[in-house]
Amino acid sequence: MENRWQVMIVWQVDRMRIKTWNSLVKHHMYVSKKAKKWVYRHHYESTNPKTSSEVHIPVGDARLVITTYWGLHTGERDWHLGHGVSIEWRQERYSTQIDPDLADQLIHLHYFDCFSDSAIRKAILGHRVSPICDYQAGHRKVGSLQYLALTALISPKRTKPPLPSVRKLVEDRWNKPQKTRGHRGSHTMNGH
């Protein structure tokens, strides 16, 4: 019998991002209770030796599964040390992989307080408006003029620690161009 391959999209991330993600998830599951329906699975609960952790996030009838991996082949760069993340949408027997932006939007819609477009209607009707959006990563579009005016009038408060963002987890912080200090550049580059 032939080998059967299954291809998955795994986002290469650095180990410290995974550590930060896991600690934020646990904080919001056990301390702030904003993610109390989420399920965290340790590496020893998985049959796959490459799985370091799994977070199951119920989203309506379905669930998001964010799986972190270790011991993968290293990447092209020295800092790609074999750690990765996959993001999967599962509903009954159907599953598909999704990108980090969509995962953030789904989490945002189902779990966190949001100062959204409904605030405009409430303000016009004279109702009290809550100026909070706990999950700014879920907002990708530019708001309407009324929405922008309301956000300028009532500034949202920041939560500490921040809520876990899948987009932030898979963000490539290594390949961004480095900013040098001042107009003369760095001291080591120009020999002073």
From Swiss-Prot:
Gene coding for it: vif
An example Gene Ontology CC term for this record: host cell cytoplasm
Compositional bias annotation for Basic residues: 176-186
Region (Interaction with host APOBEC3F and APOBEC3G): 54-72
Region (Interaction with host APOBEC3F) residue spans: 14-17, 74-79
One Pfam family from the record: Vif
Swiss-Prot/TrEMBL GO biological process terms: viral life cycle
Species assigned in the record: Human immunodeficiency virus type 1 group M subtype H (isolate VI991) (HIV-1)
Protein family per UniProt: Belongs to the primate lentivirus group Vif protein family.
Modified residues (Phosphoserine): 144, 165
Motif residue range(s): BC-box-like motif: 144-153
GO MF: metal ion binding; RNA binding
Processing and modification events after translation: Processed in virion by the viral protease.
Record InterPro entries: Vif
UniProt region (Interaction with host APOBEC3G), positions on chain: 40-44
Annotated segments matching region Multimerization: 151-164
Binding residue positions for Zn(2+): 108, 114, 133, 139
Domains as described in the record: The BC-like-box motif mediates the interaction with elongin BC complex.
Region (SOCS box-like): 151-180
Additional observations: Vif-defective viruses show catastrophic failure in reverse transcription due to APOBEC-induced mutations that initiate a DNA base repair pathway and compromise the structural integrity of the ssDNA. In the absence of Vif, the virion is morphologically abnormal. HIV-1 lineages are divided in three main groups, M (for Major), O (for Outlier), and N (for New, or Non-M, Non-O). The vast majority of strains found worldwide belong to the group M. Group O seems to be endemic to and largely confined to Cameroon and neighboring countries in West Central Africa, where these viruses represent a small minority of HIV-1 strains. The group N is represented by a limited number of isolates from Cameroonian persons. The group M is further subdivided in 9 clades or subtypes (A to D, F to H, J and K).
Compartments where found: Host cytoplasm; Host cell membrane; Virion
Region: Membrane association, residue numbers: 171-172
Superkingdom per UniProt: Viruses
Protein's UniProt name: Virion infectivity factor
